[in-house]
Amino acid sequence: MTLTIYNTLTRQKEPFEPLEPGKVRMYCCGITVYDYCHLGHARTCLVWDVVRRYLQWRGYQVQYIQNFTDIDDKILNRARKEGTSMEDVSERFIKAYFEDMDRLHIQKADAYPRATHTLDGIKRLVYELEQKGYAYPADGDVYYSVRSFSDYGKLSGRKLEDLQAGASGRVDLEDSESQKKKDPFDFALWKAAKPGEPSWESPWGLGRPGWHIECSAMVRERLGETIDIHVGGSDLIFPHHENEIAQSEAATGKPLARYWMHNGMVKVGGEKMSKSLGNFTTIRDLLAQFDPMAVRLFILQTHYRNPLDFTPKALEAATNGWQTLQEGLLFGYLFGEKLGWDQLSSNSSVREDNPLVQQFQDAVDDDFNFAGGLAVLFEIAKDLRKEGNILVHQEKTETSPEKLKEQWQTLVQLSQVLGLEAHPPQVHRETTDGLTDAEIETLIEQRTQARKAKNFAEGDRIRDDLKAKGITLIDQSGGITKWHRS
């Protein structure tokens, strides 16, 4: 079966044909680093992690880039509130991001460009747009002239005449800015410096970049003028991705991306999970209650384009589902020796003509239907669980040891494609240099006091020292820190 992708741009499923055979260039709009990530962020990062894993499993060489927005009003507001700098806030929450993603078993991108590290490319792109007549300066600001780009609205399907200015919370429509714009739909590419805010030299004076221009510059600098797949949450379709297209395609005259993919939002009580609504659950709070693999399973059981309804009952059901898969994944470690397997390895390649592999691929090839792929995994896991129970009670199995080994290897490898892994039982190794629980709690309290005193360097030192000794700290909302031994 041919891999098909639902393309937001064309509003239909299309066969996947990369620009260069065997290679995929993929860009994901990342987070604004001003707070801890919530389940909505987890879904976005996890979905594209598994899309990337699947493309690699299908034989593609994937170059995957995900950005950090580290210049933003929300970051500046937090820095002012804490009496620290924009850089301190960004660095702290970038570290927290990686801690959360590591626990969710999300692979690192090939690069994480930041807005502050891409300023030269941003200024070049703004200058190009101005020279080509798509942008205009106004008292130190530079605005993109939306009506100058005839294809504006092609991604979202929105027409300017049908829109009300300011429909998106990310469009700047403060009175002073509105007066500078030639059209209320125009958006800022470069913002003039304001007192007390970071700023950089530019042809238009001191200032900082607008939000939309950052991604256009990063894509161009890291992946080229046209890429294979551009991804992000569905809340970014308009205006962010629409504006990206307008900027990039006006500058180059080429399509920004061949395929546009968007994941649905996580919802709570019918509303989008977001910090602004206060209805969010942070990843670290969630992982204090649920196994990371259960959270992965919860996210993958709903098609990536559909909304995901978050309820405790749904997580509990995913936990039960993970226990079933986990039993199957551990089957070889628990029963392999008893079955006389000559070599306990899950790495032997599975046959391409294996019907279970074909069922899995046929499901996921249909616009990344991970739920369909999971159905195949559950079928294998339940068979292995049944055979394990028979072996325990009757000292025999209904299926041959050779067939069971093939089933187990198939389950392990297909689960790895989805980032689902169960660690084999092993004897606990002492890795904490003899630290007692009380000593660990004392160090955590010292770190808490250092952070309250805005001494984030000391707090980071204590955390890193504990990590080197096999102690992982999990910061949660409300100033609570939990820990576990690796």
Curated annotation (Swiss-Prot):
EC number: 6.1.1.16
Protein keywords: Aminoacyl-tRNA synthetase, ATP-binding, Cytoplasm, Ligase, Metal-binding, Nucleotide-binding, Protein biosynthesis, Zinc
InterPro entries, A to Z: Cys-tRNA-ligase, Cys-tRNA-synt_Ia_DALR, Cys-tRNA/MSH_ligase, Rossmann-like_a/b/a_fold, tRNA-synt_1_cat_dom, tRNAsynth_Ia_anticodon-bd
'HIGH' region, short sequence motif: residues: 31-41
Gene3D superfamilies tied to this protein: Cysteine-tRNA ligase, C-terminal anti-codon recognition domain, HUPs
GO MF terms, alphabetically ordered: ATP binding; cysteine-tRNA ligase activity; zinc ion binding
Cofactor(s) the protein needs: Zn(2+)
Residue positions binding ATP: K275
SUPFAM superfamilies with a match to the protein in the record: Anticodon-binding domain of a subclass of class I aminoacyl-tRNA synthetases, Nucleotidylyl transferase
Binding annotation for Zn(2+): C29, C215, H240, E244
Gene transcribed to yield this protein: cysS
Protein name: Cysteine--tRNA ligase
Family to which this protein belongs: Belongs to the class-I aminoacyl-tRNA synthetase family.
GO cellular component entries: cytosol
Primary localization class, coarse: cytoplasm
Subunit structure: Monomer.
Pfam families named in the record: DALR_2 (PF09190), tRNA-synt_1e (PF01406)
Subcellular location: Cytoplasm
Reaction(s) this enzyme catalyzes, per UniProt: tRNA(Cys) + L-cysteine + ATP = L-cysteinyl-tRNA(Cys) + AMP + diphosphate
